[in-house]
């Protein structure tokens, strides 16, 4: 879903994901914002999670979710809720080089 009026819908994304899987793709990365469009008003951890969850339910290959994940706890909760198989972290890691170490500690104390 590209969040543009008249753009790609979640149903379109699921259709494409199934075709990509059939073509031999090994992993799907659900992300966005790099083309200039974001999901207005939705900045919660894993803000593309409705889309990643729909795709995950439709395919048998791993689905990676990127977007809005700031902490290890955010990542773990998204995984536990079945939103994705893997979590991508971008800006949070760029802001804090110790992010991975802190994420491990946070998840171990959950």
Q: What kind of feature is each model-predicted range?
A:
Residues 1-110:
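Flavin-dependent oxidoreductase catalytic cores
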């Amino acid at each position: 879903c590209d969040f543009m009026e008249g753009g790609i819908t979640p149903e379109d994304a699921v259709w494409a994901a199934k075709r990509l899987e059939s073509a031999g793709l090994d992993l799907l990365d659900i992300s966005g914002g790099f083309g200039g469009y974001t999901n207005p008003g939705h900045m919660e951890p894993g803000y593309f999670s409705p889309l990643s969850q729909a795709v995950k339910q439709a395919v048998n290959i791993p689905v990676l979710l990127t977007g809005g994940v700031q902490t290890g706890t955010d990542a773990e909760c998204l995984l536990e809720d079945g939103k994705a198989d893997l979590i991508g972290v971008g800006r949070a890691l760029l802001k804090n080089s110790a992010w991975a170490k802190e994420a491990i500690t946070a998840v171990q104390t959950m």
